[in-house]
Amino acid sequence: MSVDLATVKRVAKLARIALPEDEAERVMGELNGILGFVEQLSEVNVDGVEPMTSVMPMAMRKRKDAVTDGGKADDIVANAPETDRHFFLVPKVVE
């Protein structure tokens, strides 16, 4: 697969990137190089290879889910001019 100049210009327009004509030629070459590398990767035989998310085998530490108020209610309303039981009080706007 390769991209032509029209495709490069269309992608630049969709991405809202100003792309001068001389830059479009260079970008076309770079994109074709990237696509060539991706095609090489698709030729690699990965039969029997386990999918992985990291090169280092790691297990996430899990904690028990617990619902809390975060312990920050006093800090959150500390600078509010008026509060009532950790709720902000604001002037009535709609009649």
UniProtKB/Swiss-Prot annotation:
Keywords: ATP-binding, Ligase, Nucleotide-binding, Protein biosynthesis
Annotated TM spans: none
Gene3D superfamilies in the record: Glu-tRNAGln amidotransferase C subunit, N-terminal domain
Pfam families for this protein: GatC
EC number(s) recorded for this UniProt protein: 6.3.5.-
Catalytic activity: L-glutamyl-tRNA(Gln) + L-glutamine + ATP + H2O = L-glutaminyl-tRNA(Gln) + L-glutamate + ADP + phosphate + H(+); L-aspartyl-tRNA(Asn) + L-glutamine + ATP + H2O = L-asparaginyl-tRNA(Asn) + L-glutamate + ADP + phosphate + 2 H(+)
UniProt-recorded Gene Ontology molecular function terms: asparaginyl-tRNA synthase (glutamine-hydrolyzing) activity; ATP binding; glutaminyl-tRNA synthase (glutamine-hydrolyzing) activity
Record's keyword annotation contains ATP-binding: yes
Keyword Transcription regulation recorded: no
GO annotation, biological process: glutaminyl-tRNAGln biosynthesis via transamidation; regulation of translational fidelity; translation
HAMAP family listed in its UniProt record: GatC
Function: Allows the formation of correctly charged Asn-tRNA(Asn) or Gln-tRNA(Gln) through the transamidation of misacylated Asp-tRNA(Asn) or Glu-tRNA(Gln) in organisms which lack either or both of asparaginyl-tRNA or glutaminyl-tRNA synthetases. The reaction takes place in the presence of glutamine and ATP through an activated phospho-Asp-tRNA(Asn) or phospho-Glu-tRNA(Gln).
NCBIfam families, per database record: gatC
Quaternary structure and partners: Heterotrimer of A, B and C subunits.
Protein family membership: Belongs to the GatC family.
Record protein name field: Aspartyl/glutamyl-tRNA(Asn/Gln) amidotransferase subunit C
UniProt gene name: gatC
